[in-house]
Amino acid sequence: MNCRELPLTLWVLISVSTAESCTSRPHITVVEGEPFYLKHCSCSLAHEIETTTKSWYKSSGSQEHVELNPRSSSRIALHDCVLEFWPVELNDTGSYFFQMKNYTQKWKLNVIRRNKHSCFTERQVTSKIVEVKKFFQITCENSYYQTLVNSTSLYKNCKKLLLENNKNPTIKKNAEFEDQGYYSCVHFLHHNGKLFNITKTFNITIVEDRSNIVPVLLGPKLNHVAVELGKNVRLNCSALLNEEDVIYWMFGEENGSDPNIHEEKEMRIMTPEGKWHASKVLRIENIGESNLNVLYNCTVASTGGTDTKSFILVRKADMADIPGHVFTRGMIIAVLILVAVVCLVTVCVIYRVDLVLFYRHLTRRDETLTDGKTYDAFVSYLKECRPENGEEHTFAVEILPRVLEKHFGYKLCIFERDVVPGGAVVDEIHSLIEKSRRLIIVLSKSYMSNEVRYELESGLHEALVERKIKIILIEFTPVTDFTFLPQSLKLLKSHRVLKWKADKSLSYNSRFWKNLLYLMPAKTVKPGRDEPEVLPVLSES
């Protein structure tokens, strides 16, 4: 009978004890602030001879061995083969050596910081798994410090358990799911008039009875694996099963002696739920035609039955994969289309004015037929015709009408030409602005005079409040300081402004006139036949 089938498997004993007669582990981790000892193992097997020289050494990093003695630190005590710390601190981390005659034993000690917000330190917790309804026992004892221990307390999740025995508290019961948690044994002891404590913590996980698990293979029952001839493939079969269950591979007899098929060693680990996770890999090297379209079956077997999943190797071309040249060609086409779209968008942004004008010309769109207004634009400009303002005045009353009216077929409202003398000028201006689709403002250094102030205020009211008219700003001469303008016009100034450049704006096909037509209402253009294509030269001064 296998030892794991003995009834003793029904008993789970967790003995929280530090009763080892010597310290055999070469690497040790302890928590700061607790008593700790190192003991050489040979001393427990042989009678120590009084005359035998025993020495303890410490080495930290690149430092040489330093011999330890009671004068090294008040926290260190030497008792033949035992080195005691009262208590151990962070700076005690390092390598320790015990030397007796020609024999030397070495330990590597790592002292970690205590968790001040918990009754235990997570890095010093031992995990244990207990099956539900199995016998569960926790006994708190410490044989080395037993004579110094005053009392011992047992905590669950940092809450003290009220037990009868304060010297060696013990729990004995059948495990239930409610028993899961962190159990800490804390020993309180006195040494040289000081109080110390030693803590040992276990993380107890209660799981279902593992003997009742129904084994199951993970993943789909049928798997098609795309492979290339001459390559290698690994078929991984994983299952959740019981400890005594087995997992194995089966495939056709004709491949049974195939030297390119190998079963790797089974790997098993226990999950946090207490179940066994097994994995077994079938490795097929240098895949040939005989390995294709063959069933490779993975089976898990238990006393309650079996479960099987299958793998079939197929050629990659049979899986309708995209050929490499088709994929490359598709990627090139996709990149070219993306570049073309980016270029098209860039061209549209740069030449949007030309495109809009071309669209208007192509569709012969006219926005002025049904809006009930008389003029396409009211021109606001400086009325004082002084020598220094002569060219600005000429631009407003001669150049704009010549181009927009005679060449492009628009109808403008010019103050000097269209306002009837002797009438109520204020009312007349307000009426003309209401009848206009645009308000063209010719800006200059001397623009804000009393004569144009009302035109501006009325036009801004129509544009910003009633939204019945759109404003077009033309900067005839460079203006650096716009503090003379109303705040509302400054807001418009932050948007698009057309700048007149005499040397570059003379041609009707110049950027200035195209931008002005873009801002004007769409209208069927009827250019004059006798009009020259270039304006007379005007300076910018």
Swiss-Prot record:
It holds the Pfam family TIR. The active site is at E455. Residues 373-520 form the TIR domain. Keywords: Disulfide bond, Glycoprotein, Hydrolase, Immunoglobulin domain, Inflammatory response, Membrane, NAD, Receptor, Repeat, Signal, Transmembrane, Transmembrane helix. Its main location: membrane. The keyword Transcription regulation does not apply. Highly expressed in leukocytes, spleen, lung. Also expressed, but at lower levels, in liver, small intestine, colon, prostate, thymus, placenta, and heart. Specifically coexpressed with IL18R1 in Th1 cells. The chain crosses the membrane at residues 330-350. The keyword Signal applies. One of its GO terms (molecular function) is signaling receptor activity. Within the IL18 receptor complex, responsible for the binding of the pro-inflammatory cytokine IL18, but not IL1A nor IL1B. Involved in IL18-mediated IFNG synthesis from T-helper 1 (Th1) cells. Contributes to IL18-induced cytokine production, either independently of SLC12A3, or as a complex with SLC12A3. This is Interleukin-18 receptor 1. It comes from Homo sapiens.
